[in-house]
């Protein structure tokens, strides 16, 4: 999702499948429809309100189940995409940025991206290369998560405050976000406020 966010910030735009993936992710974090509409309107700062309302607003509302057929409204729209869905979807075409970067990026570009985000350990980067080569994308992603949260993970393990299930392999972008948020806010007393639990996610 960080890749989609960076693309959005750089270009003030995402193509359809990138918008769909990111909108559903934001929905899974607990962002309301109104908040999501504001987010996209502010992000698409190079277009007019009229163009945004005509070309983009309806799709966002549809993703949330606010419009569309009865089944869509009853089901409250679409569920956030799981890792499995993202790595089995067709690869993005030119100008598109959706999907799982562990699968869609050339390995050297992926490593460069990870280095820019603070993954500096050569052994970790080497292991990620091997994981990607073997198409073990979720393992590579979890390796990055463990590296970037190693202090917090060590703390909850030592304290016994998290069960083994709480640290299971991550197989959903919203789980990645939620677990990261909770680890980074340990001891703040409100670490459970992030929405989008596993029951709300697409397997």
Go through the PLM ranges and name each one.
Residues 1-20, 24, 28-203:
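Basic, alpha-helical nucleic-acid-binding regions used in initiation and control of genome expression
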């Amino acid at each position: 999702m960080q890749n989609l966010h960076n693309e959005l910030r750089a270009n003030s735009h995402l193509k359809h499948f990138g918008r769909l993936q990111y909108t559903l992710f934001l929905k899974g974090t607990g962002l309301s429809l109104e908040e999501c509409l504001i987010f996209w309107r502010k992000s698409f700062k190079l277009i007019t309100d009229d163009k945004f309302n005509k070309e983009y607003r309806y799709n966002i509302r549809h993703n949330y189940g606010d419009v569309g057929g009865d089944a869509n409204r009853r089901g409250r729209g679409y569920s956030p995409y799981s890792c499995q869905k993202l790595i089995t979807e067709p690869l993005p075409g030119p100008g598109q940025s959706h999907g799982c970067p562990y699968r869609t990026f050339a390995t050297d570009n992926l490593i460069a991206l990870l280095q820019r985000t603070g993954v500096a350990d050569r052994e970790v980067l080497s292991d990620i290369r091997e994981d990607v080569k073997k198409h073990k994308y979720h393992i590579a992603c979890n390796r990055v998560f463990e590296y970037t949260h190693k202090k917090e993970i060590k703390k909850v393990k030592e304290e016994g405050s998290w069960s083994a299930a709480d640290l299971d392999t991550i197989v959903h972008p919203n789980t990645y976000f939620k677990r990261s948020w909770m680890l980074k806010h340990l001891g703040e007393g409100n670490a459970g406020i992030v929405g989008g639990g596993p029951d709300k996610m697409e397997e």
